[in-house]
Amino acid sequence: MSNGPDQSLKNRVRERAKLAIRGGLHRLDLDVSKGVYTRQVARTLAARGDDTVLDIGANVGQYGLGLRRSGYDGRIISCEPLSGAYAELERRAHRDPHWHPVNAAVGREPGEVDIHVAANSYSSSILEMTQAHLDGAPDSAYVAVERVAVTTVAEVVERFGVDPARTLLKIDTQGYEAEVLAGAGDLLGTFDALQLEVSFVELYEGQQLAEQTIAVLREHGYRLQSLETGFSDPSGRLLQADVLVVRDH
């Protein structure tokens, strides 16, 4: 694949076109926003008095938009590294005074990193994709690489004056969840709730699997609140799920 200026421009145009199509599907309620589960998350936030959401791996803002449509009116801080996805996220957030977009990846430490851009945008990852992922989602192959800035959960908390005890930390980073948690440092056990996408099969090379991730969360005092199954391979084997964990008050 050529990395010249013409190819780079074509890749950006291709990504923006796909994002525009997804935006249209969202308006027709056909987007991948997982509306029913998002409403359940919003109810949990309301019941627990949480007024801030750190949306790590925001893509085009479908998670934040789903929360708003579900009645959540607190602060949302959405981090998205890819330029094309971030442009759509920024467009959605700019009229909402309590929705703050951040153009950066989130990881173990600040810096820069190359991220692989997937054909479907939302499967993009810092990690290499495995064949198991491609078999389960053939439209997710990588088509480009983009250099992006990296921040940490701890930095975002400090920058925005976040109170972790009233905050949901949501992480959807395509296999990079363990690195995001590492970047939270000592804050990990202080967030009131966490929502993560976990994998039962290695979909990205070197990623932490669901069993270990859930064990780490339990060690930090979290219990399972709810779970939504994600996508499966052609045989019906479950590959991913979203889990919501909370601290006991």
Question: What does each of the following model-derived ranges do?
Answer:
Residues 2-249:
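Phosphate/nucleotide-binding beta-alpha loop and adjacent structural elements of enzyme active sites
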